Amino acid sequence: MSAAEIAALLRNAEVTGGEIRRAAIHLPKPLRASLYDETSREHRTAEGKFFEAFVYEMLLAEAEQSDSVVSVAAKLSDACYVPYDKYAKDGLWYSKDGGIRFKVSGRVAAEVDFLVKTTDCVRIFGEVIVNPAKAGNLASEVAEKRALLERLYECEVQFVLVCAEQVKEPKYLRETDAAVVLESGHLMYQRLHPNEVLHKKSAPAKSTRRVDGTVW
């Protein structure tokens, strides 16, 4: 399985209310409130975080139905935070909010939005961005993250860019990479009434594919 096939899984997915709800509930309560308040300074940040969580929940759901996906790294409220051990070797360490981060010599060297591994041992990382055209130095960031992951895992890795607005396919993508547009995916929360989200507790989706990122 390839990055293009992961992109196709997302593109062809049938979105459910449960996925949208779980995605919104991954956000801390203050950000959930900002999600439904267009006057909030944090509104756009909340939409971006929601979109990231939404893609993660879609990946879990689609992976469960696919024999080609062996694992999706847990993140956000599904992740298990462990304080950093300064004697540990370089690798993945979750942030307190469940972000997927890689530390080198004790410092955060990279953060990625998702990690997927296929049954034929292809490792894929992804970035989730509403509009990549506004993302600044995304090309150099992707190159640096790719180089780090290939060094840590000693294999070639593929990349998927997920965005919510139509853009030209970036020139920096390799032939093995892929891009997918989930149009207005950052607005899916609007399908839910705020009361379905604002004060609910997180409950992880049932998944046989979700794994701790440290064993991805």
Predicted regions and their residues:
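Intrinsically disordered, low-complexity Ser/Thr/Pro/Gly-rich regulatory segments
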Residues: 1-216
